[in-house]
């Protein structure tokens, strides 16, 4: 089966207007899935969403929401290490995910803390996410942990290596916790895509893409996309792919190149 592409409605189809209108525009362009950032928009650059209107648009068009972000953005490692708001809002996020039919919530690591060893912080993340998974047990919502690049977009973030996301996922050891592999972040960090995907294996539960350099649409940078999707397919991943990029042209037109490649990957 061809890969199912999910445009990020924070960045794509903004020409259509509000988020629910972007869902309709994506569907009109032939997409059957979309993704988004935080549902309530408490963390910039996400903005608040009319959840009932968004649900109506998803239902009306038969569009699948593939992923949303956890809220609020949490600095897990920075003293005093109070995670209560994260756990409280996690339940709210799961309720919204259920309402919108979204099977995944994206989580992160926050900023690393210079006063603690890296390994200690990774092990703390395991405990934090074990508790999170236990809290939402029975929800059928999967938490996916994203490593991000620190060279360009997220300086100071603790998790900047796919291998460390995989380490945390192995430690959590749950079918409802896995790795979000972002090919853009991985490439910017200089990782070997094939090696990282092979090492992470079936821990990869979601994928996002953008070209590099620039974080524009596939075809705007230097990534060899036929090769990249071939590597992804060879790794065994057959789930949806989020299109999380900043388009340099009209949204639908910006998707044409990667849609052609994904159709035969």
Give names to the regions the model predicted:
Residues 1-103, 174, 246, 252-265:
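N-terminal pre-domain/capping segments
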Residues 11-13, 38-40, 71-74, 109-113, ...:
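Active-site-proximal loop/turn and secondary-structure-junction residues that shape catalytic pockets
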Residues 50-60, 128-136, 196-199, 227-231:
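Catalytic-core regions built around general acid/base machinery
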Residues 35, 67, 106, 144, ...:
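Conserved beta-strand positions in the central sheet of alpha/beta enzyme cores
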Residues 15-16, 20-23, 76-81, 155-162, ...:
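Gly/Pro-rich active-site loop or hairpin
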């Amino acid at each position: 089966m061809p890969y199912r592409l999910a445009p990020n409605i924070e960045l794509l189809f903004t020409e259509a207007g509000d988020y629910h209108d972007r869902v309709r525009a994506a569907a009109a362009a032939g997409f059957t899935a979309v993704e988004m950032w935080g549902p309530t928009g408490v963390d910039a650059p996400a903005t608040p969403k009319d959840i009932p209107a968004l649900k109506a648009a998803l239902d009306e068009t038969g569009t699948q929401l593939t992923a949303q972000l956890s809220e609020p953005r949490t600095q897990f490692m920075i003293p005093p290490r109070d995670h209560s708001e994260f756990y409280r809002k996690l339940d709210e996020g799961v309720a919204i995910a259920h309402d919108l039919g979204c099977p995944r919530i994206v989580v992160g690591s926050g900023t690393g803390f210079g006063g603690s060893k890296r390994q200690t912080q990774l092990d703390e993340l395991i405990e934090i996410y074990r508790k999170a998974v236990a809290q939402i047990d029975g929800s059928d919502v999967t938490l996916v942990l994203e490593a991000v690049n620190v060279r360009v977009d997220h300086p100071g973030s603790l998790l900047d290596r796919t291998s460390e996301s995989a380490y945390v996922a192995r430690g959590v050891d749950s079918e409802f916790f896995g790795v979000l592999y972002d090919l853009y972040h991985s490439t910017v960090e200089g990782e070997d895509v094939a090696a990282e995907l092979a090492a992470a294996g079936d821990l990869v539960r979601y994928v996002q893409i953008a070209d590099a350099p620039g974080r524009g649409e596939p075809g705007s940078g230097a990534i060899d996309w036929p090769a990249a999707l071939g590597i992804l397919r060879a790794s065994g991943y057959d789930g949806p792919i989020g299109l999380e990029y900043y388009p340099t042209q009209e949204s639908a037109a910006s998707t044409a190149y990667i849609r052609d490649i994904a159709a035969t990957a």
